[in-house]
Amino acid sequence: MARVTVEDCLEKVDNRFLLVMLASKRVKQLFKGARPLIDNRGANKNVVVSLREIAAGKIGCEIGKKGR
């Protein structure tokens, strides 16, 4: 597999800080036993898997106003 870069992920998520939050949340999910949404035969670490999922468009986020 090709290397995943921050630039690949920023095509899907506009903000670097949001990217970090999204990736860290996904890493926690993977650590707790969630199944990867991409092929992980290379036994990549959870951080790499989460970034690959974001770059592939398998994971995203929505930002909206908080309701009361």
Curated annotation (Swiss-Prot):
One molecular function GO term is: DNA-directed RNA polymerase activity
Q: Which EC class is the enzyme in?
A: transferase
Kindly indicate whether the keyword Transferase belongs to this entry. Answer: yes
Provide the catalytic activity annotation.
RNA(n) + a ribonucleoside 5'-triphosphate = RNA(n+1) + diphosphate
Specify one Pfam family: RNA_pol_Rpb6
Keyword Transit peptide: yes or no? no
What does the record give as EC number? 2.7.7.6
Q: Which GO terms describe its cellular component?
A: DNA-directed RNA polymerase complex
Q: Which UniProt keywords apply?
A: DNA-directed RNA polymerase, Nucleotidyltransferase, Transcription, Transferase
In Gene Ontology terms, what is a biological process of this protein? DNA-templated transcription
How does the record describe its quaternary structure?
The RNAP catalytic core consists of 2 alpha, 1 beta, 1 beta' and 1 omega subunit. When a sigma factor is associated with the core the holoenzyme is formed, which can initiate transcription.
Q: Which HAMAP family match?
A: RNApol_bact_RpoZ
**Per its database record, what is this protein's job?**
Promotes RNA polymerase assembly. Latches the N- and C-terminal regions of the beta' subunit thereby facilitating its interaction with the beta and alpha subunits.
Family according to the record: Belongs to the RNA polymerase subunit omega family.
What name goes with this protein? DNA-directed RNA polymerase subunit omega
Q: Which organism is it from?
A: Citrifermentans bemidjiense (strain ATCC BAA-1014 / DSM 16622 / JCM 12645 / Bem) (Geobacter bemidjiensis)
Q: Gene that codes for this?
A: rpoZ
